[in-house]
Amino acid sequence: MSKRPNFLVIVADDLGFSDLGAFGGEIATPHLDALALEGLRLTDFHTAPTCSPTRSMLLTGTDHHIAGIGTMAEALTPELEGKPGYEGYLNDRVVALPELLREAGYQTLLSGKWHLGLKLEQAPHARGFERSFSLLPGAANHYGFEPPYDETTPRILKGTPALYVEDDQFIDELPADFYSSDAF
């Protein structure tokens, strides 16, 4: 029997494929280049215009509307709220790749931004990741504290409060010097 391959999927928001050295980019990305040169490079994935719809397509292999992420949850308008395809989380009409991998005996881990649901029953552990440390919302605070805001602070500057989970538990408190890029 042949050995099954290990594989690693990296999702990087706001990074074009041509930004990486392995794809001819000018930015030095030696570690990512080494992974790309030693492995299989997928070169024909078509993205949605924003991150969570793209994430849902990558994890399910289907259209983001079928997966429940017709748009980012933060961008849902009152006209779309509650409509099929606009649930704002990875719905149960689709099977996620980590669920299939677990059934096949793979170990699965997610570290980083999830942006596919804000409740524990929508978090990575509920979609096949046996271990996870993740920031559930998109565009959230990546530090271990929430800055003070008042009513005069424009909404766009307030951002989204950080909401981290480890496996199936919300994290109530992060170290004061926490920064997500260091943790992930």
PLM feature spans:
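Formylglycine-dependent sulfatase
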Residues: M1-F184
